[in-house]
Amino acid sequence: MAHIFVYGTLKRGQPNHKVMLDQSHGLATFRGRGCTVESFPLVIAGEHNIPWLLHLPGKGHCVAGEIYEVDEQMLRFLDDFEGCPSMYQRTALQVRVLEWEGAGGPGDSVQCFVYSTATYAPEWLFLPYHKNYDSEGPHGLRYNPRENR
């Protein structure tokens, strides 16, 4: 089992969360809420208003999200779903635990895999940086789901 940190459309209440619930993809168990220990730019970009965590540690904000425990089958599914390694890259980072469900929490922080990108258009650096993504947020950039494209 591995921990993953989701900050965008895979979070509860967001457009792609349904894939986290579909056990045909593998197992994903919600463990808690957290935020990245390091700051990163989280931008909304492209014609489909996709949230992107730019792999630029030290810039932007500590990004809020959710921590899941996933099995190997779900991890492989998510790699494919996130277009890893061409669109996003899966890297490990420390996540500060804000809330944990169940006994035996990991302590102050936990190492998680996250899908971020080091390949992006230069103008993305000038987009607004977000702390907490919500497709319906005040930014007005509603995510366009794959099934609508």
Swiss-Prot record:
UniProt keyword list: Lyase
Active site: residue positions: E82
A molecular function GO annotation: gamma-glutamylaminecyclotransferase activity
Cellular component per GO, a single term: cytosol
EC number: 4.3.2.8
Transmembrane segments: none
InterPro entries xref list: AIG2-like_dom (IPR009288), GGACT (IPR039126), GGCT-like (IPR013024), GGCT-like_sf (IPR036568)
GO biological process, one term: modified amino acid catabolic process
Reaction it catalyzes: epsilon-(gamma-L-glutamyl)-L-lysine = 5-oxo-L-proline + L-lysine
Top EC class for this record: lyase
Gene3D superfamilies xref list: Gamma-glutamyl cyclotransferase-like (3.10.490.10)
Binding sites annotated in the UniProt record for substrate: Y7, G8, T9, L10
Coiled coil start-end: none
PANTHER family listed in its UniProt record: GAMMA-GLUTAMYLAMINECYCLOTRANSFERASE (PTHR12510:SF4), TROPONIN C-AKIN-1 PROTEIN (PTHR12510)
Family per record: Belongs to the gamma-glutamylcyclotransferase family.
Function of the protein: Contributes to degradation of proteins cross-linked by transglutaminases by degrading the cross-link between a lysine and a glutamic acid residue. Catalyzes the formation of 5-oxo-L-proline from L-gamma-glutamyl-L-epsilon-lysine. Inactive with L-gamma-glutamyl-alpha-amino acid substrates such as L-gamma-glutamyl-L-alpha-cysteine and L-gamma-glutamyl-L-alpha-alanine.
Subunit structure as annotated in this protein's UniProt entry: Monomer.
The protein, known as: Gamma-glutamylaminecyclotransferase
Organism expressing this protein natively: Rattus norvegicus
Native organism taxonomy: Eukaryota, Metazoa, Chordata, Craniata, Vertebrata
